[in-house]
Regions:
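Short, well-ordered beta-strand segments
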Residues: 166-171, 774-775
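Bacterial N-terminal signal peptides
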Residues: 32-47
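Globin-like tetrapyrrole-binding proteins
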Residues: 934
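Active-site histidine-acidic residue metal-binding/catalytic motifs
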Residues: 59-63, 68, 149, 195, ...
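Primarily short, surface-exposed interaction patches in extracytoplasmic proteins
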Residues: 209-284, 299-352, 414-415, 458, ...
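Intrinsic-disorder-associated, low-complexity terminal segments enriched in Asp/Asn/His/Tyr and depleted
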Residues: 2-10, 46, 69, 711
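Short, low-complexity, charge-dense intrinsically disordered segments
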Residues: 3-19, 24-27
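Solvent-exposed helix-loop boundary motif
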Residues: 43, 59-165, 174-224, 240, ...
Length: 948
């Protein structure tokens, strides 16, 4: 075989990326380390027809784009004179970086207290730290500007420095008269009045021009922000693009050919609504959106210690609870209550025969997601860490707040007292008492119903009966073997041999022992049973095959319903504030309660005495965070960015919402209409905002003399909308104001599931134990179970058809992650994931070019095309339809056919003897392999990996 020359210009001219891909299959791996080859790979991944490129960005940004982004990210001009105050603008910076040494401790570094302007002016050991109006004369500014303070590598940002310098220059103003003692005011009015802590209020719908009267509420709010900035909506995405987008968004799968043709044939005004209704009714909706929730829940099927990452074999029951809840459109308020306190919704004792009881207990698996290594390393510190991680998961997923900072001291950024943290912890401590701890194995709940137990017992009896029959026949056969060996001895010793072998070993005489040593093949029946392979290998194999029937019978058993859940012991649990977060140093006792900053805006409607009270308090419709946070999460997964871009941090250190009125309107609307998430999805995906194009279509141009502001609300002004897209791209490069759709890369699971779908392999069955992932001999995570022989690795038993199940159903063990999923940013749950990365890195391209699983899927797809169409043009058309939900352009068709033929030609010339023999038997094999090359190139393209 010819070697692939990575640096040869002639080589790269002769061979496209597909040739390199397929050559690598035959040569084990092509040499792809040279920069030139890597550049070729990255460029060729998206080489299918620039003419068909609908605004799809390639891996590298253009210099103009980079310049635009830098301009947008640059620090704004100095604030207007007198506009800065200490409490609002400066104190948060100093609190984050300086208060630990200069304020919070009884002994302050340099005797300098930075918590009050008055004390900065008074100064410390080095004199006055602040001279209002004169930054150059202010010691605090000099230390910051010279990078002397704060100590360590983390310094103030340029923007923070600008704020402090401008504030001093403006006179070091305060918002109000300062208190005499800074300890009296642990948080300011500005911190307590942060937007996210204020109650949700339903805003009025913005006014729009007469031409925009058709706009839905979402679009009115978006239009209002666009109009303020002289921007407008972009053109609508074409129907195929919209269908692919919404199908992936709601189910995580590509649309089928039938779904595409049905939608294109439906010319009614309700065509899109019918599509959305169908997708929301699909069981695959629950699979897709469960993945998003499981990210924030920190879902994992192992305990988390690297060396002893013990599996959680029953955790999949919680995963199935989430899928079922979402498919059933369980109202979000109920969803939260069940996960926080489902066990308390049951009248004791729980009845295993009541499926509702089992479901409610399974829901509390939410509180069992945090790492817990106490099974093998049960220390107070590890117990405490599990509780802390659980609290972090609860607060970030439901409240959108990071409370962990308040374990040791008042929160660095948000108005959360250390006492607040331990009050919140006291809500959950009865199920996780660190001084009455139960290890993971001691917290399993068996909810197996009587019918299942009876069925299991009957099947076990059947298996035992068959096993006994096999054992009896095997012993009879071994008795025959024993007698054969005795008969092979001289007649004079046969009876003594029989007497010796029937005598228990400890009772044998020396003469009997000597006799048996002379005839080593004469053994007890038990010995021969164990060593039958040495006496009669054929019989040994026959009995092994019969025992497979026993295993098959046992495989019919319905599964025990064992749940990883929580429950309260009933014993009182006292909670304390830990000094500096140390569980060995408990301080003042505390009772369960809400964060004080939230209570300051509205008191709980009833006392919070435990988990159920707290869960009901969160979901009573008046909480300022719960509805906002879930609305933002749903928006995030439809647009690639939330209205708040820090979905797990709605606090002062997070970003403010780009569209606060829209966020509040949607949050209020969610509560008003019963917390139904499917209704929220409909509102979003049927909006004009969601339906915009992500880029200009081929041949689009901006008409001369037209601007985006001519008629920004008009649904028919396509030329104007195209101009609006350019306006939005140039003036809003981050798409904060939603003047176009954001291009989004598919996440890891959607990529794998889509490859399985288009190659006609996907198994869409729901529920059940996770498909095993194991470490092979090379240390790589693969689908299947390890097979051991005498304690040593003997291979991987594949998962069969289950290997093609959706990625949600693969084992989620922390230390074993499939290479494909990990390469495309499958998150680590430490302790959970608020926002996934969407990286673009070289290993992704190399994996899609060389991974054996991807190559096999490409071949499976080629076989599907081969049987699905006869003409080459139709096969290429079907490939594009499956991969991109659209037919190829004329140029793409020509390029693809030519590429396919070049690939087939190359395969016809391979000299490998086995391959030559296959070609003689199957003359079309080379063409099929060439088609597989084309399929792999489509899979590796940006158009497949991204949603437009």
């Amino acid at each position: 075989m010819n070697r692939v020359d990575a640096d040869s210009t002639d080589s790269t001219k002769r061979r496209g990326i597909g040739e390199i891909i397929m050559l690598s299959r035959f040569s084990c791996r092509a040499l792809l380390t040279a920069t030139s080859t890597l550049a070729l790979a990255l460029a060729a991944v998206d080489r299918i027809s620039p003419a068909g490129h609908s605004g799809l960005r390639t891996f590298a940004a253009s210099p103009a784009d980079v310049a635009l982004d830098r301009t947008a990210a640059s620090v704004s001009d100095e604030p207007a004179a007198g506009s800065l105050t200490f409490e609002k603008d400066v104190r948060p910076i100093l609190k984050t970086h300086c208060f630990l040494c200069h304020g919070e401790e009884p002994e302050k570094a340099g005797e300098l207290d930075l918590r009050l302007v008055r004390r900065m002016v008074a100064g410390g050991d080095s004199g006055a730290a602040l001279v209002p109006g004169e930054p150059d004369a202010s010691l605090v500014w000099h230390r910051i500007d010279d990078d002397e303070m704060p100590p360590g590598p983390k310094k103030l940002s340029d923007q923070e420095r600008t704020v402090i310098s401008a504030w001093i220059r403006q006179g070091a103003n305060t918002a109000r008269e300062e208190p005499l003692d800074p300890d009296e005011v642990r948080f300011t009015e500005e911190e307590r009045g942060h937007w996210a802590f204020r109650p949700v209020t339903r805003p009025e719908l913005p006014a729009v021009p007469e031409t925009g009267r058709h706009l839905a509420p979402i679009d009115r709010f978006v239009y209002d922000k666009l109009h303020e900035r002289g921007l407008a909506f972009s053109a609508a995405a074409d129907r195929r693009t919209w269908l692919r987008r919404v199908t992936f968004d709601l189910t995580g799968l590509p649309p089928t050919r039938e779904e595409i043709s049905d939608f294109l044939a439906d010319g009614s005004a309700d065509a899109k609504r019918r599509v959305v209704d169908r997708l929301l009714q699909s069981p695959q909706y629950g699979v897709r959106w469960a993945r998003h929730w499981l990210d924030v829940a920190g879902y994992a099927e192992s305990e988390g210690q690297v060396e002893k990452d013990r599996p959680r074999p029953h955790m999949w029951r919680y995963r199935d609870y989430v899928v079922d809840a979402l498919n059933g459109d369980l109202p979000y308020d109920r969803f939260v209550v069940e996960q926080l306190a489902g066990d308390l919704l049951i009248d004791d004792p729980a009845d295993p025969n009541d499926d509702r009881h089992a479901r409610l207990i399974a829901a509390t698996g939410f509180l069992r997601q945090a790492r817990d290594i106490t099974q093998t390393d049960d220390t107070l510190a590890n117990r405490n860490q599990t509780v802390a991680d659980t609290l972090d998961i609860v607060s970030s997923s439901i409240l959108g707040l990071t409370v962990a900072c308040a374990q040791c001291h008042d929160h660095r950024y948000d108005p959360i007292l250390i006492e607040d943290y331990y009050r919140l912890r006291a809500v959950f401590e009865p199920v996780m008492p660190i001084r009455q701890w139960r290890k993971p194995s001691e917290r399993l709940v068996d909810m197996t119903d009587d019918a299942t137990r009876a069925a299991r017992a009957a099947i076990e009896a059947e298996a035992v009966a068959l096993q006994q029959e096999i054992n009896d026949r095997r012993r009879a056969h071994c008795k025959t073997i024993q007698e054969r060996e005795i008969e092979a001895a001289p007649e004079a010793v046969r009876d003594p041999l029989r007497q010796a072998i029937d005598t228990p070993p400890k009772e044998r005489t020396p003469a009997q022992t000597t006799l048996l040593d002379r005839y080593p093949k004469v053994r007890t029946i038990d010995w021969i049973v164990g060593q039958l392979v040495e006496y009669d290998n054929a019989a040994h194999r026959r009995f092994q095959e019969e025992e497979k029937q026993v295993a098959a019978i046992r495989d019919r058993k319905p599964l025990d319903r064992v749940l990883m859940a929580v429950g309260e012991s009933g014993s009182p649990v006292e909670s304390h504030v830990f000094f500096r977060g140390d569980p060995e140093s408990p301080g003042e006792p505390v009772g369960p309660g809400e964060l004080s900053v939230l209570v300051s805006h509205r008191a709980p409607r009833s006392a919070i005495e435990g988990r159920l009270d707290y869960a009901r308090h969160l979901t009573d419709g008046a909480h300022p965070l719960v509805a906002r946070v879930i609305v933002n999460r749903v928006w995030l997964h439809h647009f690639g960015q939330g209205l708040v871009r820090t979905p797990g941090d709605f606090g002062l250190n997070g970003e403010r919402p780009t569209h606060p009125e829209l966020l509040d309107w949607l949050a209020d609307d969610l509560v008003r209409h019963g917390w139904g998430l499917k209704r929220l999805h409909r509102q979003i995906v049927l909006s004009r905002t969601y339906g915009q194009a992500s880029g200009l279509a081929p041949g689009d141009r901006v008409p001369a003399g037209r601007s985006a502001s001519d008629d920004p609300a008009s649904p028919t002004g396509d030329e104007v909308a195209r101009a609006a897209w350019l306006d939005s791209r140039q003036r809003d490069p981050e798409n904060r104001w939603l003047g176009r759709m954001t291009l989004r890369r598919l996440d890891a699971e959607a990529i794998r599931d889509a490859i399985l779908a288009i190659s006609d392999q996907l198994d869409v069955q729901l529920s059940g134990p996770s498909v095993a992932i194991s470490e092979d001999q090379e240390g790589k995570a693969v689908i299947g179970s390890r097979r051991l022989r005498d304690g040593l690795f003997a291979g991987i038993d594949g998962a069969g058809r289950e290997a093609a199940r959706r990625s949600l159903y693969l084992s989620a063990q922390r230390s074993l992650r499939l290479e494909l999923l990990q390469t495309f940013d499958l998150p680590e749950m430490v302790p959970n994931c608020q926002l996934r990365d969407a990286s673009t890195v070289t290993p992704q391209a190399l994996l899609l070019m060389n991974d054996g699983w991807v190559v096999n899927a490409s071949e499976q797809m080629a076989r599907r095309l081969w049987s699905g169409a006869d003409a080459a043009e139709d096969r290429v058309g079907l490939a594009f339809e499956l991969a991109f939900a659209r037919p190829p352009t004329a140029e793409e068709l020509d390029d693809s056919l030519a590429f396919w033929e070049r690939q087939a030609d190359m395969f016809r010339q391979f000299s490998d003897p086995d391959w030559r023999e296959q070609l003689r038997e199957q003359p079309g094999a080379a063409s099929l392999r060439g088609l597989a090359s084309l399929c792999q190139m489509l899979i590796a393209s940006n158009r497949f990996l991204y949603l437009e």
